[in-house]
Amino acid sequence: MMEKRQPELCPGSPDAESGPGKREDAAIISRQNGCKEDEESKREEGDKEGGGRFKGDEETDDVPLQNSSNGTSISIIINGVTKETASHNALDLKREVPVIELSRRDAIKAVEQRTESHLVPITELRRPPQLPLPPQQRDDARMVQLSPNAFPVPARAMLYNLAQPLAAINSLGGESEQYSMYPSNRVKRRPAPYEVELDEAKIVRRIFTNSRERWRQQNVNGAFAELRKLIPTHPPDKKLSKNEILRLAMKYISFLSNLLEDQDGGRNVSSTTDGETGLMVGAHEVGPQGGPHQDRVVGLARDDIMETMSPGSSCGSLPDGDADGSPESFMEDQDSPPAPRTLTASRGPPLHLTTRDLRRNGRPLDGSSRR
């Protein structure tokens, strides 16, 4: 017959204070932790093997022998083997276990919050958030908004007087009548400068006309350059305008024609007229002995021509009225010539001079001449 072993307890120990209530709590704890099921299974196996054991042994299997406030150690005799099981107080478990778990969770959460609070600003400083890409279907609206608005929309409408483009711009914004200044039925559509339609035939015709005019101008300039080379001037490289070139060419041609007529030397010497001075030199019928008089008259005409071709002459510098080189002024001078005066001389033929030539020359042609 097996006896239960009970250790001696000190009177001041917390185990000695435990009573029947404590034992019942320990039994409840052992059932909750699954210890009771293990003990019952082992006890049934021991009953089958031992068979002749006493009932007192079976009754004393579940009796706790030692209890404590913090934990109870239970000595159980199963098949002659003493087994000790430890169980905590139910109140202590209810108080300690949830508190420990909650404290752990709170501590973990607090640590995570601290780390997040420290990491979030650093992450924002190092890695700024990316801007979202604009949608592709609103490209037209963005282009209208990005266009520079130097004037407000009503001012631009007054400046350009474009009603349809203004309505198109307002339709994009969704407020078509906010900037409408005039009703659409009164405004007439006017083409903008960039909307001028150019026909291909017009372009080709314009190009052909420009090229033809350029070619004509080049030919005219070339002809004037060739004519300028034939006109003798005192500075050979003197620059002359087109009007001056034409006037000098006419005078030079008339001088050469008169010179050729004088060199023929007939009995009836026709009167020669200078183109510039209007000097008309007439001769009576003279024979071959009249050569000195003819040479003197030709010499005077040559001197007058050279004077007109000099830089200080009126031909080199045109009058104020003829600065533009208009042909009307030249035709007026040729159409209405002044009446010439006749100067008689005792020696030589009569001389016909105009009033303008008398004022310009201011000197007598011969010492014995009289007015």
UniProtKB/Swiss-Prot annotation:
One GO term describing the cellular component: nucleus
Pfam families referenced in this protein's UniProt entry, alphabetically: HLH (PF00010)
Tissue: Expressed in the main hemopoietic organs in adults, namely the kidney and the spleen. Also expressed in the liver, brain, gill and gonads.
Keyword Transcription regulation: yes
A GO MF term: protein dimerization activity
Name recorded for this polypeptide: T-cell acute lymphocytic leukemia protein 1
PROSITE patterns in the record: BHLH
Organism name: Takifugu rubripes
Biological process annotations from GO: angiogenesis; artery morphogenesis; definitive hemopoiesis; endocardium formation; erythrocyte differentiation; hemangioblast cell differentiation; hematopoietic stem cell differentiation; myeloid cell differentiation
Compartments, record wording: Nucleus
